[in-house]
Amino acid sequence: MAAYLFTCSILQTLSEAGKIEIAEDKLLHYLGELPGTPNGPVQLLENICTILEGQGRATHGNVIRHVLNIVVTEQELGGLGISGKSWEEVDEHTLHEIKFLTDAWLTAAESRAAARHLPQPLKQQDTRRLPMNLAEKILAHHAFSVPRRERVVAGDLLRVSIDWVIASELSWVGMKHSVTSLDMKPSAWRNDRFWLSGDHTVDPRTYHDKRVQALIKGLESAKRDLKMTENQGSNYTIMHTEFVRERAEPGMLVLGSDSHTCSAGAVSALAIGLGAGDVMAGLATGETWFKVPECIRINFTGQPAWYIGGKDVILSVLKQLKRNTYAAERIVEFGGAGAKLLSCDARFAISNMCTVRDPNDRPELKPTADDRSTSRNLVLLQAFLFPTVSLNRLSIAAGARYEGASYASTFEIDLGEVEPFIAIYPSPDQVCPVAERTGMRFDGCFIGACTTTEEDLVLAALVLEAGLKRGLTLEKGKRIVVPGSLPIVKNLRALGLLDIYKACGYEQPAPGCSLCLGIGADVAEAGSQWLSSQNRNFQNRMGRGAVGHICSAATVAASSFNMTLTDPCDLLNDVSETTFKEYLARCKVARGGSESKLAGGKQANNVQYIEPCLLGENARSAEGEVPALEAAAVSLDDARLGSINSRIYKLDDYVDTDALPQIIPAPACVGSPTDEMLGSHCFELTNPDFRDYVRSGHRVIVGGRAFGCGSSREEAPRALKGLGVQCVIARSFAFIFGRNMPNIGMLAIVLTDEAFYKAAQQGENIEVDVEGRVVHVAGQTFPFSLDDMELQLIRNRGLAASYQKLGSKVFAALCQKPAPLPISALADATLAQGGSIGRQMDW
C-alpha cells in the first residue's frame, strides 16, 4: 500500500510541477508487479528516468536522475542514504522527503529558466576595452547596464544580478523579519540558489531548548515554503564550509547575511556579506546594487614551508598591513607566483579572515605603489579574490591579463617568511610569532570554526599523534574540536584521525560555530583563557568575560598537551610531509567519489579564458530583454522629510556590533526579536545609561571612526531604531553597518570636519535638515553628502518597504538616478582637504 500511494503521489508531482504525464498502464511496472521488476523507491526513480529519457524529455530526466543521486548518497554527504533499500525498509518520512525533492528540483528547472541569464562572455578581449581588475570584471558582467563601454571604475553605481544567497538559521530570522514585519511572505527568485544552514546556535545538545526549537522550525519552514533544494538543515555544515566546497564557482556574485561570506573568495567568487534585509531583497529579486569599490592587490612571493597553512598566512598579512588601513572598504585581490602554491583550503582560511576589523595601529608594510588611503580607518571590505579559473564555468582572464588594471595599492608578502603566529586578545591583528610568546597558560584549547579547514584538522591530528608517540601527557584543561561539516567528519573518521583527537581528550560536538560565537551549547567561562583556531578574538566573543587568542590548528594541537603555548615546529619535525599529503589526497578522492549535488554540474577539463560582456544602457541581455532602467514603470515616494531636532549622545571611535563597545549583545539577537525588544538591550554591557538618555531626548548619536564595525548583524541598527535613535553622525561607518542604516530607513551621516566634533558635545542641541543636507549645532552649519538612493530609501522607510511598494522593480527604481557626484571625485575632494573618506566610499 505504501508503494502504491507513494507512486501515485510521485506521478501527481510530475504532473503538477513538471507538466509530465505518464500513461496509466506504466503504473504496475513501477510497483514491481511485473515479473523480474526490482522493488523499492530507488528502482521507481530509475524507471521514471528511463521512461522520460525515452520520451525525449532529457531535461526532466536529468532532474529525476539528480534526485535519484541525492536519494542514494550517504547521509553524511548530504543525501538520504537508501541505496538498495526495499519499500519496507524506507520509512514514511523518507518517502515524503523524496517527494519533496522531486517537487523542488522540478520547480528549480522552471525557476532557472525564468531567471535572468547573464550575457555570453567574450572569447577574446575587446580592443576598445580598458583593463579591469577581477572584481570590476565580475560586477561588470553581472550588471544590467554599465555607464561606459570601455570599463567600469570605482564609484560606478551598478544594478546587478546575483548568483547565490547564503544565510544561517540566526540570520534567516532577521531576513524573514524584514518582510513579515510588513505583512509580506519571504520569496526566492530561484529556489535552487538559496543556501541555508543551521550552524550558529543550534546543536544536538540543545535541541530541547525552546529558542533552538524555534530556529529549527524556521529552517524547516523556509525549506517547505520556498521549496528549497539547498536547505542544509541543522548541524550538517557551518554555512561557509560546504558552500565553498560544493557550490561556489569562480566569477560568481554571492550575497550572504554573514560577514564571513567572503570565504567564497577562495574560489575567485565575489562574495559579500550584507545586512539581513539587504540580502532578503536580493533573495526575492535576484538583484542588488553596488558602487564599484576600489581594490588593492597583494602579491604572494616565495615558497611557504609545507606545514604553513592559510591561518598563519593571513595572520602574517594582518601583522604587516593591520586592519582598517590600506584595505579599508576595498576589495582585496591576492595573486602572484606564491598564490599558486596555496591550496584551496589555505585560500579559504585567508579569505575567511578578510572580514576582521579595528584598531589604530599604523601599517608596517610599505606599499609598492602610490597609496591614497593612509588617512582611513574603516572596515575591511567583505570580499576576497584569487584571480584564477572560471566565470560560471568559463574561465576569467588571470595573470598577465590583469596588467594595467587599476589598484589603489599593491603589496608583496613573502610566504617564505611566514611562521607560526598568534593573535593576542582582543584583536586579530595584534600578531607576533608563537616563538616569542611560548609559556602562556590556557584553561582551554579549541580547534574549529569555519576558518579551520579540512587540511588544518588533518595536520593538527598528525601533530597530536606525534605528541602521543613521544609520550607527552595531558594536563588538566578543556579541549574541543569541531570539524566544519559532516563530510569532513566522515573523512577524518576514515583516516582514523578522530580517534587521535579522542585519545588526546578532545570533545567532538556536531559541526557548528561552537565557541567561535559563544552563544550556543559551548560558551567559555568568564575569566577563562583559551587558545583557539577560530577567526575572531574580540572581547566576549567566546563567552562573556572569556579571553581568547587565535592561531593555527597545529599550534593549538601542540599546545594542548600541557595547556601552554608551544611552537608546533618541534612536533612537526616528527610529522611526515608525505603522510600529510597522502591523507589530503585520500580526502580529495573521497570527495570526488560522489557526483555534485548541483543538478547539471560539470567539471571543466579544458580552461577557456574569457572576458566579461558589458551591456550598455540599450543593450540586450541573453534572453533579449532591454536592461535599461524602467523609470517610467516605477514611482518613488517624493514626500519631503522634516528636520530632526534632538540632543546629542556622544560616542568614541570603533563602536562595534560584536566587541566592546557593543551595540547589541549576540544573545539578544536569538529568536525573533522586534526592534523594540532589541532596543531594550542596546549598549547594555558598556553604556547602561544610554537607553535612558535616548528616551529623554538624546536621539542623535555622534560617533567617531568605523562606527558599526564588527559583523553583518542588522540587529545593531535595528536596536538603535527600536530605542528611538533617529540619526547617527560619524567620521566613517563600517561598510555593512553604513549600508544597513538606510536599508532600515535610518539616517547615517558622514562628517569629517573637526569643527563639527568640537561643537557637537554631549547634550548639545542639534538640528539635522535632511532635505537640505546640512547640520546645525552650536550656532554653526555643516553640509553633508547623501546619495539620492539613500535619501529615497529613508523616504520609503527602508528597503523592505520599498520592495513592498515596487516589488521586483525595486532596484530598477532605486538605481535610476545616479549619485549626485562620482564617488571617486568625492574621495579626491575629501583627501585634497586632508580629511577621511568615510562612508562616501561605500558601494
From Swiss-Prot:
Any Pfam family the entry gives: Aconitase_C
Top-level taxon in the UniProt lineage: Eukaryota
Sorted UniProt keywords: Iron, Iron-sulfur, Lyase, Metal-binding, Virulence
Gene, per the UniProt record: AMT8-2
Organism (species): Alternaria alternata
Assigned protein family: Belongs to the aconitase/IPM isomerase family.
Protein function: Aconitase; part of the gene clusters that mediate the biosynthesis of AM-toxins, host-selective toxins (HSTs) causing Alternaria blotch on apple, a worldwide distributed disease. AM-toxins are cyclic depsipeptides containing the 3 residues 2-hydroxy-isovaleric acid (2-HIV), dehydroalanine, L-alanine which are common for all 3 AM-toxins I to III. The fourth precursor is L-alpha-amino-methoxyphenyl-valeric acid (L-Amv) for AM-toxin I, L-alpha-amino-phenyl-valeric acid (L-Apv) for AM-toxin II, and L-alpha-amino-hydroxyphenyl-valeric acid (L-Ahv) for AM-toxin III.
Gene3D superfamilies hit by this protein: Aconitase, domain 3, Aconitase, domain 4
Chain residues that bind substrate: D258, S259, H260, R536, R541, S712, R713
One MF term in the entry's GO annotations: hydro-lyase activity
Name by which UniProt lists this protein: Aconitase AMT8-2
Positions annotated to bind [4Fe-4S] cluster: C450, C513, C516
One record GO biological process: L-amino acid biosynthetic process
